[in-house]
């Protein structure tokens, strides 16, 4: 993408933007929360809508000149309703976390109780971590995965819900590789007479394509990100039934935000249009197949894959059983040097710190966008294993880097 206008006024920024694009083209993105949107979505997010304030909602704006903002937002809403089958959709949240904030504003008062999955077991900061506003505003108790299986302990969750009596139970996770049984979590919510928030930030695309169970129609509120597995404009989304529609809309604006980022809403509209295609369904199916192949490859090499595999787009590896002296950060750094971008991650029963944890999290959404299938993903897994076995081997890093260069040339991005 030519950036001549930026280069004319700010060569430094133009260089950084061009370098970032080149970095993405020349490396393999395996951070589970990242993906590559289409040129069409990029174009929408860089459109003149970035200039437009549109406080309010379609047909009910606080400013004049919003006819095309209304049109774009209405398209995004209609397409989201079709994708996920929701009665009501709000596409204005700036992020998944702000979508969660709006739900909390709707359902809770300060001091009310949240029951959510522990962060080291696959939860998320916005579900009640002490460093997050949720942990500072609400009373939080957390449930865990079964230490033997790595699966959510649904019976333990019901017991904890009965004892803790939460006002809301949060499902949906940032590092949980198995399919979520939303109806079983709803049983726990019913037992406690609590709301149920399903945060599907990571799996919005998988749910839309029908390759993961949907919480829509089960949970009271469903939130998500719109730039991960769904490959739309960056931001968040909220879905609910009509009973909560007005409260949710008021919690987003004016409760949590001012004007929506209309250029991002445009990117959501375009990405949702793409996701309504048969090609997107095939993409989501391949994403899961690729993750399963990656999990099998790592398992075959003797690594400990949390829960024994995956049902979605990500694989979580506990390095301690096979490589007790190796940290996730050491593996992350070695792989980055070779052009494979993933992240160190905490694992259930973590014995190190969040800054230098014992695990790694890898995902296949971006590789699948590039056109990778099982055979190519298996090769990437084998390359990863070479550096996991010795993250300090410079010759191995160089050899893996050469192979990554070949793969990125064979499966180009934005060319």
UniProtKB/Swiss-Prot annotation:
Protein's UniProt keywords contain Transferase: yes
Residues annotated as site: Plays an important role in substrate specificity: 227
Stored InterPro entries: PyrdxlP-dep_Trfase, PyrdxlP-dep_Trfase_major, PyrdxlP-dep_Trfase_small, Ser_HO-MeTrfase, Ser_HO-MeTrfase-like, Ser_HO-MeTrfase_PLP_BS, SHMT-like_dom
Pathway: One-carbon metabolism; tetrahydrofolate interconversion; Amino-acid biosynthesis; glycine biosynthesis; glycine from L-serine: step 1/1
Modified residues (N6-(pyridoxal phosphate)lysine): 228
Binding-site residues, (6S)-5,6,7,8-tetrahydrofolate: 119, 123-125, 353-355
Top-tier EC class: transferase
One Gene Ontology term, aspect cellular component: cytoplasm
EC number: 2.1.2.1
Cystine bridges: none
Reaction equation(s) it catalyzes: (6R)-5,10-methylene-5,6,7,8-tetrahydrofolate + glycine + H2O = (6S)-5,6,7,8-tetrahydrofolate + L-serine
Similarity field: Belongs to the SHMT family.
Role according to the record: Catalyzes the reversible interconversion of serine and glycine with tetrahydrofolate (THF) serving as the one-carbon carrier. Also exhibits THF-independent aldolase activity toward beta-hydroxyamino acids, producing glycine and aldehydes, via a retro-aldol mechanism.
Descriptive protein name: Serine hydroxymethyltransferase
Organism from which the protein derives: Haloquadratum walsbyi (strain DSM 16790 / HBSQ001)
UniProt gene name: glyA
């Amino acid at each position: 993408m030519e950036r001549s206008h930026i280069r004319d006024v700010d060569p430094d920024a133009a260089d950084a933007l061009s370098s970032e694009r080149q970095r993405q083209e020349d490396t393999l993105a395996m951070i589970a929360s990242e993906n590559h949107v289409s040129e069409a979505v990029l174009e929408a997010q860089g459109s003149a809508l970035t200039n437009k304030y549109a406080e309010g909602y379609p047909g009910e704006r606080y400013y004049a000149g919003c006819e095309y903002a209304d049109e774009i937002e209405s398209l995004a809403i209609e397409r989201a309703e079709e994708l996920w089958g929701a009665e009501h959709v709000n596409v204005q949240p700036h992020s998944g976390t702000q979508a969660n904030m709006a739900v909390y504003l709707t359902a809770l008062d300060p001091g009310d109780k949240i029951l959510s999955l522990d962060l080291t077991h696959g939860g998320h900061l916005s579900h009640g971590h002490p460093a997050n506003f949720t942990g500072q505003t609400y009373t939080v108790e957390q449930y865990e995965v079964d230490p033997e299986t790595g699966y959510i302990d649904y019976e333990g969750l019901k017991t904890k819900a009965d004892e803790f009596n939460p006002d809301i139970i949060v499902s949906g996770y940032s590092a949980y590789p198995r399919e979520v049984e939303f109806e079983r979590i709803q049983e726990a919510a019913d037992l406690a007479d609590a709301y149920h928030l399903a945060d599907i930030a990571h799996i919005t695309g998988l749910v839309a394509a029908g390759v993961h169970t949907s919480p829509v129609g089960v949970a009271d509120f469903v939130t998500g990100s719109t730039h991960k597995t769904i490959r739309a404009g960056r931001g968040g989304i909220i879905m609910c039934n009509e009973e909560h529609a007005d409260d949710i809309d008021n919690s987003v604006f004016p409760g949590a935000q001012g004007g929506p980022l209309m250029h991002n809403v445009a990117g959501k509209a375009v990405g949702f249009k793409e996701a309504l295609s048969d090609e997107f369904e095939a993409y989501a199916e391949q994403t899961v197949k690729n993750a399963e192949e990656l999990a099998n490859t790592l398992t075959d090499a003797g690594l400990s894959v949390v829960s024994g595999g995956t049902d979605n787009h990500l694989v979580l590896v506990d390095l301690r059983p096979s490589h007790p002296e190796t940290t996730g950060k050491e593996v992350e750094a070695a792989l980055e040097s070779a052009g494979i971008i993933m992240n160190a991650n905490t694992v259930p029963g973590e014995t190190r710190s969040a800054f230098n944890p014992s695990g790694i999290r890898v995902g296949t959404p971006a590789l699948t966008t590039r056109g990778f299938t099982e055979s190519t993903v298996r090769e990437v897994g084998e390359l990863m294993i070479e550096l996991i076995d010795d993250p300090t081997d410079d010759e191995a890093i160089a050899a893996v880097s050469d192979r990554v260069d070949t793969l990125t040339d064979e499966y180009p991005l934005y060319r």
